[in-house]
């Protein structure tokens, strides 16, 4: 018989640096999960990724306090900022542009995120990433 699911916990944790401090510790502690066990497993799974990259993770907590977790791809905004060499997006994206990004780079990001996105095809996902880029104050070039 399958284990009974008690809760789902969604967090964004920096790759390779999960530790018991907030937000990880309090979120897992409330559900009675072994925090250090999660931190060690998460750090082991993300050790080959660029250190400090925010990784969304969905933790499934079972009624016996055991858990499983699934890591996802980094947020599109992080990938766009990295590709454009920015620290942050524009405070006023409609009037103040902060950089440019090539459409080919956006398509590459869409292909990276394809596993997590629910788009119909790669073109739809590319348009979605383009919208994110424009809302950050980036100009999309061909």
From Swiss-Prot:
What keywords are annotated for this sequence in UniProt?
Methylation, Ribonucleoprotein, Ribosomal protein, RNA-binding, rRNA-binding
Instruction: Write down the CDD domains for this protein, in alphabetical order.
Output: Ribosomal_L11
Q: How is it modified after translation?
A: One or more lysine residues are methylated.
What SUPFAM superfamilies does the entry give?
Answer: Ribosomal L11/L12e N-terminal domain, Ribosomal protein L11, C-terminal domain
Does the UniProt entry include the keyword rRNA-binding?
yes
Q: Which GO terms describe its molecular function?
A: large ribosomal subunit rRNA binding; structural constituent of ribosome
> PROSITE patterns, from UniProt?
RIBOSOMAL_L11
Q: Which Gene3D superfamilies match?
A: Ribosomal protein L11, C-terminal domain, Ribosomal protein L11/L12, N-terminal domain
Q: Which InterPro entries match?
A: Ribosomal_uL11, Ribosomal_uL11_bac-typ, Ribosomal_uL11_C, Ribosomal_uL11_C_sf, Ribosomal_uL11_CS, Ribosomal_uL11_N, Ribosomal_uL11_N_sf
- Highest taxon listed in the record's lineage: Bacteria
Q: Which GO terms describe its cellular component?
A: cytosolic large ribosomal subunit
Kindly list the biological process annotations in GO that this record carries.
Answer: translation
Q: Which family does it belong to?
A: Belongs to the universal ribosomal protein uL11 family.
What job does the chain carry out?
Forms part of the ribosomal stalk which helps the ribosome interact with GTP-bound translation factors.
Q: How does it assemble?
A: Part of the ribosomal stalk of the 50S ribosomal subunit. Interacts with L10 and the large rRNA to form the base of the stalk. L10 forms an elongated spine to which L12 dimers bind in a sequential fashion forming a multimeric L10(L12)X complex.
- This protein's name: Large ribosomal subunit protein uL11
The record lists the organism as: Shewanella sp. (strain W3-18-1)
Classification of source organism: Bacteria, Pseudomonadati, Pseudomonadota, Gammaproteobacteria, Alteromonadales
Supply the gene name: rplK
């Amino acid at each position: 018989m399958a284990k009974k699911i008690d809760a789902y916990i969604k967090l964004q944790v920096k790759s390779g640096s999960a530790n018991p401090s907030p937000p990880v510790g309090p979120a897992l502690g409330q559900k009675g999960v072994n925090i250090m066990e999660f931190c060690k497993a998460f750090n082991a799974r993300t050790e080959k990724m660029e250190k400090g990259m925010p990784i969304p993770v969905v933790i499934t907590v079972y009624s016996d306090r055991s858990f499983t977790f699934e890591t996802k791809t980094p947020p599109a905004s992080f990938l766009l900022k990295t590709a454009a060499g920015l620290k942050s997006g524009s405070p006023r994206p409609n009037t103040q542009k902060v950089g440019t990004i090539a459409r080919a780079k956006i398509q590459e990001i869409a292909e990276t995120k394809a596993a997590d996105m629910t788009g119909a095809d790669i073109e739809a996902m590319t348009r979605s990433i383009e919208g994110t880029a424009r809302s950050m104050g980036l100009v999309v070039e061909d």
